[in-house]
């Protein structure tokens, strides 16, 4: 951790039980999920994936754009307080908005064309905001839901870890309960930067590597509130793991099982949702044990042309390259994929 010194007490004692549950997923849970992931009652019927309470009906290409418009790569997705679905995509307008039935509402953000990556939703008091990670402009932009800019963060040169501001390429953000903002430099130098709610720099940690506390493409970041104290969890993608930190950047543990190329997160109650770039979406329980893999397309990343497979080569009920995913209030899941023409899939809860 660079910059401000921090007090961190009795870490080993306080976190011993948590390290145990972070170490590995339960083998019994994993074994129970070896049954086929795609269930079809009849050829013309609905496509169901998952198991038990986590069974979902699949609708690919759920979001319907006006004629003549296209998404480009679909990189981020959130659901707002009205149940509207916001897609962060690399088209003319960076943000496209849909009602709960998949009907197009409006779009905005031509000034962010081509740079759309992560998108984080935050309710702050009575207001709602978006945090957009722009890999083209190498900025994080806080906006209202209508696209009004609140503030912008560029390369944090105060961190002392950059000799060139162009090496900062933010991929995702997380917002803590106190309003602090955590920025993952996933496509840059693999740092995590912490700012306060006014976008003022606080500290930095991480940096490229595989040892504890180091990261290699920290692609996604989240504030995990499922335990007694909120913690930062990072999708340490190229290291194929999740890595946990305290809110002031102290390493706390890993999750290494049941992951291929984790991209980002969403949380609903005691469950954690993880879109995995290599062909599936994963749900973990409170102890980070596997509940289910959804739409698993094992080996898809080895196919010629991945991820831009022609539509006729995209099996129904299988994912190609999930880049982000989120729940709505009813427990339905929306998945966006890293595909040149974009793909938005709705998983309607059926279990």
What are these regions (language model features)?
Residues 41-59:
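Blade/loop signatures of beta-propeller domains
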Residues 60-68, 109-112, 151-164, 202-213, ...:
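Surface-exposed loop and turn segments in beta-propeller and other repeat-based domains
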